[in-house]
């Protein structure tokens, strides 16, 4: 594989289909603009899919899992063993994303990039085991260069499987105790912002726990701060295996011409990193929701993203993105199924 494949050309949206979809929206039996952002969503999907009437029948969800060495600093309300335990829950159907994927009729795969504790082979889990989690980034880079490259490639491979399955939409989810700390550290570096502005409770820390997390991140930023201008170095030094895989998946989606629906804070930080690695991938990213973590809003603003939902979510797993899929499907259904003024013999507003 090319060591910097993410720099390869991204697909371009179809300007002719964008124009035709916009013209169709203006002919539908409604006041122009009355369906608000649903109209623009349908137009954007038409341009990205190269179809005047887009559809989202086949959805692919991949949950990437990996552990984080920074958990040793006491930054999580949950023990590290939960990461591996949740992998079992995913494939047994008991996790939130498992339920939501079933409801959507979506394909669900789980990729173990590196849990801290070895797991038995679980049916339905791809055990890559690139490392036993990351290193503690207040002491050393979270990942070696090769580990980070392999994690990026794992995301790319997941999109390749989604493409082979004929999927029209890719959702990446994540699982990893400590990954809101890694995401916040990356966001601080990429946005050149203090930890106090971007750190939140994660899985449920109290105020003192949040303050401690911010202090831990500041220590990491002091250690790795000289590399802030390099998104790959920021990813490998402060990120996680699952965050790297998410970034790789978003980049691959743009290169293959598949729309990606980005979930919450951690996924949005991975998306920000992907955009810094290859700015052209931004057009292929839709953003599902604005989550409860305070840093999420700042990351969305940096991406000029307008999330579809605002429900106070902070679960991860891809759950917020899955919840937004019915809204996208309804936007497509309205765009394709409504009659035009001419078809319905309804008088349009005078030109």
Swiss-Prot record:
EC number(s) given by UniProt: 2.4.2.21
Top-level taxon in the UniProt lineage: Bacteria
InterPro entries assigned to the protein according to its UniProt record, in alphabetical order: Nict_dMeBzImd_PRibTrfase (IPR003200), Nict_dMeBzImd_PRibTrfase_bact (IPR017846), Nict_dMeBzImd_PRibTrfase_N (IPR023195), Nict_dMeBzImd_PRibTrfase_sf (IPR036087)
Keywords from the UniProt entry: Cobalamin biosynthesis, Glycosyltransferase, Transferase
Pfam families listed in its UniProt record: DBI_PRT
SUPFAM superfamilies attached to this UniProt entry: Nicotinate mononucleotide:5,6-dimethylbenzimidazole phosphoribosyltransferase (CobT) (SSF52733)
A GO term, aspect molecular function: nicotinate-nucleotide-dimethylbenzimidazole phosphoribosyltransferase activity
Enzyme class, spelled out: transferase
Annotated active site: 317 (proton acceptor)
Reactions that this protein is recorded to catalyse: 5,6-dimethylbenzimidazole + nicotinate beta-D-ribonucleotide = alpha-ribazole 5'-phosphate + nicotinate + H(+)
One GO BP annotation of this record: cobalamin biosynthetic process
Listed pathway(s): Nucleoside biosynthesis; alpha-ribazole biosynthesis; alpha-ribazole from 5,6-dimethylbenzimidazole: step 1/2
Family: Belongs to the CobT family.
Biological function: Catalyzes the synthesis of alpha-ribazole-5'-phosphate from nicotinate mononucleotide (NAMN) and 5,6-dimethylbenzimidazole (DMB).
Protein name (Swiss-Prot/TrEMBL): Nicotinate-nucleotide--dimethylbenzimidazole phosphoribosyltransferase
Organism of derivation: Pseudomonas aeruginosa (strain ATCC 15692 / DSM 22644 / CIP 104116 / JCM 14847 / LMG 12228 / 1C / PRS 101 / PAO1)
